[in-house]
């Protein structure tokens, strides 16, 4: 499952930027890194790079033509990929993940600060990073044409996409190119037999279409296999009853007259194919740790019957019913985020699976509560055990998972510094996730309020989603946002609402029903 990003394009007005800045203070998000942290990381980065070429701990894999694929403008590059054909219609997947443990001394200043932060927090006007930029955007980032230490996963997939073999080693790698999703999608659309759209694809520019002309053949051959890997892994997901929820990115664009316009950008197929590589790696990491009896999983319980019933009712209200007997994953895959009703369902689906967290276990721990792996190790939405293992530059727990998995893969004991941290990691990640979620929710309220400020007094169309004690939840069709409107209207009713006021400081939006027969106003 992936969450949507919230972006800001254009010169936002000072009031919005000031409010977003204040949000950091209100949520007590960390600001600048302390001097000892920066000094320690500078020294660590220098030491790692000086010693990397002769490091006995890192195999030389610099001849492999890895590339990174990320959103445009990214500098914290965690992952690089290489795909090659194998015998019997198989595909060999190599996935390099930044070796952050090489740069962070256990118990040091950087480690302590990372535990305090937990994860990178993304806001419309920037981010609050987990690590100092000298690490996350330079020394450990898999930037092109630079040797970097990495954990290199190797997966041999059969013709159906099942994993036949798994390998993991620490290695030196050198990415050949830093590519964007738009560039890769343009390249894939131009391949023989590709089902390219007849109209320009949103998120792909003319510059993206021209970029592939300079790629070497080995890079082109690798990326040409990405859709097939994505399709095979998606088929495996469907077969086990799993589902990935890929929400559109929400973006606020500033128009020439200074108004804020809210738009949604659905993930490109290349993004969804690439996401399957991270899911593949996370499931392999979980299997390794469960087999070894030491690890930390990303767990999520199955939804209860009341939650499922409420979600089904909401889908019916929106005119996109999830029928009894229809597989949940197949239902999600049938939705088109470009349709406002379908988009509302996708957002509602985020509330179906609740209770996600981290579960640590260690068969040799002194604490009896840690000695037994979880009774239900699966991440319910994925229908498989899963671990976070592919974003160590941006998420604390991945650093520990990667170190554990490497030890398990080579038959070495689990590192003592990891085992000692396992009891505390679930709470550290839960705390940082609460801060990140609060920041995301509040920032979304602020930018949605900014987008609706120019619509005060306007009447907008929407759909009544559900009735509540304090009014009716309405999903506006354009812009696609959710509002609470005083009054009562049956779920599923097409309605009109008037935007009566916007509080830019709080992000609150006041609206009233227009000609609602049951309205209280």
Where would I find each of the regions flagged by the language model?
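Electropositive polyanion-binding surfaces
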Residues: 2-24, 36-495, 500-509, 518-521
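Alpha-helical structural modules in large enzymes and assemblies
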Residues: 31
């Amino acid at each position: 499952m992936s969450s949507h990003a919230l972006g800001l394009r254009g010169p936002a007005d000072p009031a919005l930027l000031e409010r977003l800045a204040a949000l950091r203070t209100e949520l007590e998000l960390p600001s600048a890194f302390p001097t000892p942290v920066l000094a320690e990381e500078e020294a660590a980065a220098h030491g790692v790079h000086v010693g990397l070429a002769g490091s006995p701990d890192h195999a030389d894999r610099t001849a492999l033509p890895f590339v990174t694929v990320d959103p445009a403008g990214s500098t914290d590059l965690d992952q690089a990929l290489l795909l090659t054909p194998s015998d019997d219609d198989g595909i060999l997947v190599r996935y390099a993940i930044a070796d952050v443990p090489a740069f962070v001394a256990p118990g040091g200043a950087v480690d302590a600060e990372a535990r305090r932060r937990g994860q990178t927090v993304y806001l419309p006007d920037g981010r609050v990073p987990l690590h100092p930029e000298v690490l996350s955007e330079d020394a450990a980032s898999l930037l092109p044409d630079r040797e970097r230490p990495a954990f290199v996963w190797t997966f041999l997939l059969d013709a159906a996409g099942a994993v036949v073999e798994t390998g993991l080693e620490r290695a030196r790698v050198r990415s050949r190119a830093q590519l964007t999703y738009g560039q890769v999608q343009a390249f894939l659309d131009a391949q023989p037999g590709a089902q390219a759209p007849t109209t320009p694809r949103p998120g792909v520019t003319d510059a993206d279409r021209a970029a592939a002309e300079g790629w070497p053949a080995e890079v082109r051959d690798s990326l040409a296999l990405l859709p097939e890997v994505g399709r095979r892994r998606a088929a495996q997901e469907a077969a086990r009853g799993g589902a990935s929820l890929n929400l559109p990115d929400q973006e606020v664009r500033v128009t020439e007259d200074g108004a804020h316009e809210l738009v949604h950008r659905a993930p490109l197929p290349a993004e969804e194919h690439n996401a399957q590589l991270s899911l593949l790696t996370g499931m392999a990491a979980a299997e390794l740790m469960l087999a070894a009896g030491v690890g930390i999983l990303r767990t999520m319980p199955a939804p209860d019957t009341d939650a499922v019933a409420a979600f089904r009712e909401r889908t019916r209200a929106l005119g996109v019913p999830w029928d009894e007997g229809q597989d949940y994953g197949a239902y999600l895959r049938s939705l088109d985020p470009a349709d406002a009703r379908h988009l509302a369902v996708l957002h509602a689906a985020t509330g179906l699976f609740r209770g996600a967290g981290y579960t640590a276990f260690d068969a040799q721990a002194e604490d009896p509560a840690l000695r037994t792996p979880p009774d239900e190790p699966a991440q319910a939405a994925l229908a498989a055990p899963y671990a976070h293992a592919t974003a160590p530059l941006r998420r604390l727990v991945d650093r520990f998972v990667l170190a554990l998995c490497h030890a398990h893969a080579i038959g070495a004991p689990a590192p003592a510094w990891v085992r000692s941290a396992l009891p505390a990691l679930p709470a550290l990640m839960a705390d940082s996730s609460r801060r990140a979620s609060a920041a995301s929710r509040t920032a979304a309220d602020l930018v949605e309020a900014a987008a609706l400020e120019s619509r005060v007094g306007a009447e907008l169309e929407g759909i009544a989603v559900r009735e509540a004690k304090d009014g009716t939840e309405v999903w506006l069709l354009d812009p696609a946002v959710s509002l609470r409107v005083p009054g009562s209207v049956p779920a599923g009713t097409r309605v009109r609402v008037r935007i009566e006021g916007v509080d830019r400081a709080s992000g609150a939006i006041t609206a009233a029903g227009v000609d609602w027969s049951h309205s209280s106003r």
